[in-house]
Protein backbone atom coordinates (compact mmCIF):
# COMPACT_ATOMS: atom_id res chain seq x y z
CA UNK A 1 0.00 0.00 0.00
CA UNK A 2 1.36 3.42 -0.97
CA UNK A 3 2.31 5.85 1.79
CA UNK A 4 3.60 9.40 2.18
CA UNK A 5 6.97 9.82 3.87
CA UNK A 6 8.50 13.03 5.23
CA UNK A 7 12.28 12.94 5.61
CA UNK A 8 13.23 16.08 7.53
CA UNK A 9 16.30 17.58 9.13
CA UNK A 10 18.40 20.68 9.57
CA UNK A 11 20.62 21.66 6.64
CA UNK A 12 23.52 19.44 5.54
CA UNK A 13 22.09 16.15 6.77
CA UNK A 14 22.05 14.53 3.34
CA UNK A 15 18.39 14.95 2.37
CA UNK A 16 19.11 15.40 -1.34
CA UNK A 17 21.67 12.59 -1.28
CA UNK A 18 19.08 10.27 0.27
CA UNK A 19 16.48 11.33 -2.31
CA UNK A 20 18.89 10.66 -5.19
CA UNK A 21 19.78 7.24 -3.73
CA UNK A 22 16.07 6.39 -3.48
CA UNK A 23 15.57 7.41 -7.11
CA UNK A 24 18.50 5.23 -8.16
CA UNK A 25 17.12 2.27 -6.20
CA UNK A 26 13.79 2.48 -8.07
CA UNK A 27 15.54 2.83 -11.44
CA UNK A 28 17.82 -0.11 -10.67
CA UNK A 29 14.69 -2.28 -10.29
CA UNK A 30 13.30 -1.14 -13.64
CA UNK A 31 10.81 1.26 -12.06
CA UNK A 32 10.17 4.87 -13.01
CA UNK A 33 10.37 7.51 -10.28
CA UNK A 34 9.77 11.21 -10.87
CA UNK A 35 11.61 13.91 -8.96
CA UNK A 36 10.16 17.34 -8.17
CA UNK A 37 11.98 20.33 -6.70
CA UNK A 38 11.03 23.90 -5.85
CA UNK A 39 11.36 26.34 -8.76
CA UNK A 40 12.57 29.05 -6.41
CA UNK A 41 15.68 27.07 -5.38
CA UNK A 42 18.06 27.43 -8.31
CA UNK A 43 21.36 27.15 -6.40
CA UNK A 44 22.52 24.24 -8.57
CA UNK A 45 20.66 25.10 -11.77
CA UNK A 46 17.01 25.14 -12.75
CA UNK A 47 15.28 21.78 -12.66
CA UNK A 48 18.06 19.92 -10.89
CA UNK A 49 18.46 18.19 -7.56
CA UNK A 50 22.09 18.20 -6.45
CA UNK A 51 23.81 16.89 -3.37
CA UNK A 52 26.89 18.31 -1.67
CA UNK A 53 28.78 15.11 -2.53
CA UNK A 54 28.29 15.63 -6.27
CA UNK A 55 25.24 13.52 -7.14
CA UNK A 56 22.72 15.17 -9.45
CA UNK A 57 19.49 14.43 -11.32
CA UNK A 58 16.98 16.27 -13.49
CA UNK A 59 13.75 17.26 -11.78
CA UNK A 60 10.30 18.61 -12.56
CA UNK A 61 9.69 22.03 -11.03
CA UNK A 62 6.88 22.97 -8.69
CA UNK A 63 5.83 26.57 -8.21
CA UNK A 64 3.38 28.08 -5.73
CA UNK A 65 0.50 27.54 -8.18
CA UNK A 66 1.44 24.05 -9.42
CA UNK A 67 -1.29 21.46 -9.00
CA UNK A 68 0.85 18.45 -8.14
CA UNK A 69 -1.99 15.95 -8.33
CA UNK A 70 -2.84 17.00 -11.90
CA UNK A 71 0.85 17.06 -12.95
CA UNK A 72 1.55 13.62 -11.52
CA UNK A 73 -1.69 12.11 -12.87
CA UNK A 74 -0.79 13.40 -16.35
CA UNK A 75 2.76 11.98 -16.12
CA UNK A 76 1.35 8.68 -14.89
CA UNK A 77 -1.02 8.52 -17.91
CA UNK A 78 1.96 8.74 -20.28
CA UNK A 79 4.15 6.31 -18.33
CA UNK A 80 3.49 4.44 -15.09
CA UNK A 81 5.24 6.20 -12.19
CA UNK A 82 6.32 4.02 -9.29
CA UNK A 83 7.42 6.72 -6.85
CA UNK A 84 7.24 10.50 -6.44
CA UNK A 85 10.25 12.17 -4.82
CA UNK A 86 9.94 15.81 -3.69
CA UNK A 87 13.04 17.82 -2.73
CA UNK A 88 12.81 21.13 -0.85
CA UNK A 89 9.31 20.13 0.27
CA UNK A 90 9.26 22.80 2.98
CA UNK A 91 8.27 25.17 0.13
CA UNK A 92 5.05 23.27 -0.61
CA UNK A 93 1.77 24.95 0.26
CA UNK A 94 -0.89 23.32 2.43
CA UNK A 95 -2.91 22.64 -0.74
CA UNK A 96 0.07 21.01 -2.47
CA UNK A 97 0.69 18.71 0.49
CA UNK A 98 -2.99 17.76 0.31
CA UNK A 99 -2.59 17.09 -3.43
CA UNK A 100 0.29 14.73 -2.63
CA UNK A 101 -1.93 12.85 -0.17
CA UNK A 102 -4.35 12.41 -3.08
CA UNK A 103 -1.51 10.98 -5.20
CA UNK A 104 -0.97 8.37 -2.48
CA UNK A 105 -4.65 7.67 -1.78
CA UNK A 106 -6.13 7.79 -5.30
CA UNK A 107 -3.22 6.97 -7.63
CA UNK A 108 -1.60 4.57 -5.13
CA UNK A 109 1.88 5.96 -5.77
CA UNK A 110 4.30 6.34 -2.83
CA UNK A 111 5.40 9.93 -2.18
CA UNK A 112 8.73 10.62 -0.47
CA UNK A 113 9.25 14.24 0.61
CA UNK A 114 12.58 15.68 1.75
CA UNK A 115 13.02 19.05 3.42
CA UNK A 116 13.68 21.28 6.36
CA UNK A 117 11.42 21.14 9.38
CA UNK A 118 11.96 24.71 10.61
CA UNK A 119 13.36 28.00 9.37
CA UNK A 120 16.15 30.15 10.86
CA UNK A 121 13.71 31.52 13.47
CA UNK A 122 12.73 28.04 14.63
CA UNK A 123 9.29 28.32 12.97
CA UNK A 124 7.72 25.58 10.86
CA UNK A 125 7.54 26.08 7.11
CA UNK A 126 4.00 25.68 5.74
CA UNK A 127 4.89 22.56 3.78
CA UNK A 128 6.66 21.00 6.73
CA UNK A 129 3.76 21.77 9.07
CA UNK A 130 1.30 19.83 6.93
CA UNK A 131 3.73 17.04 6.14
CA UNK A 132 4.27 16.56 9.88
CA UNK A 133 0.48 16.43 10.25
CA UNK A 134 -0.47 14.27 7.26
CA UNK A 135 2.49 12.04 6.36
CA UNK A 136 2.17 8.33 7.11
CA UNK A 137 5.83 8.05 8.14
CA UNK A 138 8.15 10.67 9.63
CA UNK A 139 11.89 10.09 9.34
CA UNK A 140 14.44 12.41 10.92
CA UNK A 141 17.78 12.58 9.11
CA UNK A 142 20.53 13.68 11.45
CA UNK A 143 23.49 16.00 11.18
CA UNK A 144 25.79 17.38 13.85
CA UNK A 145 26.53 20.72 15.47
CA UNK A 146 30.11 21.94 15.77
CA UNK A 147 29.99 20.73 19.41
CA UNK A 148 29.20 17.16 18.35
CA UNK A 149 25.56 17.07 19.45
CA UNK A 150 22.67 16.52 17.06
CA UNK A 151 21.93 19.67 15.06
CA UNK A 152 18.21 20.34 14.85
CA UNK A 153 18.19 24.11 14.28
CA UNK A 154 19.48 26.39 11.52
CA UNK A 155 21.11 29.79 11.91
CA UNK A 156 21.05 32.29 9.02
CA UNK A 157 24.22 34.37 9.02
CA UNK A 158 25.22 37.72 7.57
CA UNK A 159 28.37 38.36 5.53
CA UNK A 160 30.40 38.47 8.78
CA UNK A 161 29.13 35.13 10.08
CA UNK A 162 26.84 36.69 12.70
CA UNK A 163 23.39 35.21 13.33
CA UNK A 164 20.48 37.11 11.79
CA UNK A 165 17.43 37.45 14.04
CA UNK A 166 14.83 38.69 11.53
CA UNK A 167 13.98 38.66 7.85
CA UNK A 168 11.94 36.83 5.23
CA UNK A 169 11.34 33.17 5.93
CA UNK A 170 12.70 32.19 2.52
CA UNK A 171 16.18 33.28 1.46
CA UNK A 172 17.87 30.70 -0.75
CA UNK A 173 21.42 29.85 0.23
CA UNK A 174 23.78 27.12 1.28
CA UNK A 175 26.74 26.88 3.62
CA UNK A 176 27.54 30.53 2.88
CA UNK A 177 24.31 31.66 4.60
CA UNK A 178 23.21 28.87 6.94
CA UNK A 179 24.75 26.82 9.74
CA UNK A 180 23.13 23.80 11.38
CA UNK A 181 23.48 23.77 15.17
CA UNK A 182 22.05 22.17 18.30
CA UNK A 183 19.34 24.00 20.24
CA UNK A 184 21.79 25.29 22.86
CA UNK A 185 24.08 26.90 20.29
CA UNK A 186 21.06 28.23 18.40
CA UNK A 187 19.86 30.04 21.52
CA UNK A 188 23.36 31.33 22.25
CA UNK A 189 23.80 32.62 18.69
CA UNK A 190 20.49 34.50 18.86
CA UNK A 191 21.15 35.79 22.38
CA UNK A 192 18.18 33.95 23.89
UniProtKB/Swiss-Prot annotation:
Zn(2+) binds at residues 145, 147, 182, 185. Keywords: ATP-binding, Cytoplasm, DNA synthesis, Kinase, Metal-binding, Nucleotide-binding, Transferase, Zinc. ATP binds at residues 9-16, 87-90. The active site is at 88 (proton acceptor). It is found in: Cytoplasm. GO terms for cellular component: cytosol. SUPFAM superfamilies: Glucocorticoid receptor-like (DNA-binding domain) (SSF57716), P-loop containing nucleoside triphosphate hydrolases (SSF52540). GO terms for molecular function: ATP binding; thymidine kinase activity; zinc ion binding. NCBIfam families: PRK04296.1-5. Homotetramer. Belongs to the thymidine kinase family. This is Thymidine kinase. It comes from Vibrio vulnificus (strain CMCP6). The gene is tdk.
Amino acid sequence: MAQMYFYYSAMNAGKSTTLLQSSFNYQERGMTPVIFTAALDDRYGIGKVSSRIGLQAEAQLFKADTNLYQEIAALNEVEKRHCILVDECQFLSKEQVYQLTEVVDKLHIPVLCYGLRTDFLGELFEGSKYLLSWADKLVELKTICHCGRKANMVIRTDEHGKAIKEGDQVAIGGNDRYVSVCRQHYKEALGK
